[in-house]
């Protein structure tokens, strides 16, 4: 452990690196996720980590390849990145369409599993920019697959658009250096264009953006067990920026809808 480097982020579990191998604390869902990652590699989806060895070390930690690159988070993506990421998500959903989970498979609980409409796909389910590795400012890989599992494609896209176009309140936009409302609405369109979502399929998509943000805020409150006596700033801020984002999208609904028409 002494020669392992602790990686920032990591979602809900501890993640370290030694050389080209990433070690993640395992969970009941890990075997299913390892099976999924093996399938993705066999299917030619190159933007996910490869499984190293059996997929587990002697301590039961997941063992995956390290993807070299950088992160743009918390800054904004270039416009060129959005269609690229949309195409990456399309390749992912196409690749997972033929995935057959092992017997007794288990996915990590996640509030987004049953949001949205239509058929489920197997998705990444945590598509924020903190999980997207880039090179030269363009996305090249997805990391942190612990929440992967069934999700409706429109919900995966809503999460990806919301978090990567950073449809956040004006004070956050000013602090991070985000573009105008019109520019960020256009970025949503670029991602959906890259994915190949038709104009007809985009009907009601702004509602899905708002709905996802509201449910995500509620989930943050549940996970942190927030009560009237809570005074920990971190979970309170996590709830605050999400609810303010939902309000911001409601306020700018017309601009967002016009960009997708």
Swiss-Prot record:
<dbReference type="GO" id="GO:0030153">
    <property type="term" value="P:bacteriocin immunity"/>
</dbReference>
<protein>
    <recommendedName>
        <fullName>Trifolitoxin immunity protein</fullName>
    </recommendedName>
</protein>
<dbReference type="InterPro" id="IPR011009">
    <property type="entry name" value="Kinase-like_dom_sf"/>
</dbReference>
<keyword id="KW-0079">Bacteriocin immunity</keyword>
<comment type="function">
    <text>Required for TFX resistance.</text>
</comment>
């Amino acid at each position: 452990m002494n020669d392992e480097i602790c990686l920032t982020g990591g979602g809900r579990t501890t993640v370290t690196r030694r050389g080209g191998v990433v070690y993640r604390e395992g969970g009941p869902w890990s075997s299913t996720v390892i099976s999924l990652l093996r399938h993705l590699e066999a299917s030619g989806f190159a933007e996910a980590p490869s499984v190293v060895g059996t997929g587990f070390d002697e301590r039961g930690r997941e063992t995956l390849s390290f993807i070299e690159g950088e992160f743009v988070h918390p800054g904004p993506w270039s416009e060129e990145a959005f269609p690229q990421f949309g195409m990456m998500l399309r390749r992912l959903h196409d690749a997972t369409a033929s995935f057959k989970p092992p017997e007794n498979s288990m996915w990590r609980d996640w509030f987004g599993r049953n949001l949205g409409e239509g058929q489920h796909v197997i998705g990444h389910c945590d598509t924020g920019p903190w999980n997207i590795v880039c090179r030269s400012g363009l996305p090249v890989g997805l990391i942190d697959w612990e929440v992967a599992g069934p999700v409706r494609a429109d919900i995966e896209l809503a999460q990806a658009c919301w978090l990567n176009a950073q449809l956040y309140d004006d004070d956050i936009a000013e602090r991070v250096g985000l573009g105008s409302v019109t520019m960020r609405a256009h970025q949503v369109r670029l991602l959906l264009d890259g994915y190949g979502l038709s104009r007809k399929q985009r009907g009601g998509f702004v509602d899905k953006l708002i709905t996802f943000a509201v449910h995500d805020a509620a989930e943050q409150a549940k996970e942190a067990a927030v009560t009237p006596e809570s005074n920990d700033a971190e979970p309170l801020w996590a709830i605050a920026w999400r609810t303010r984002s939902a309000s911001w999208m409601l306020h700018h609904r017309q601009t967002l809808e016009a960009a997708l028409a």
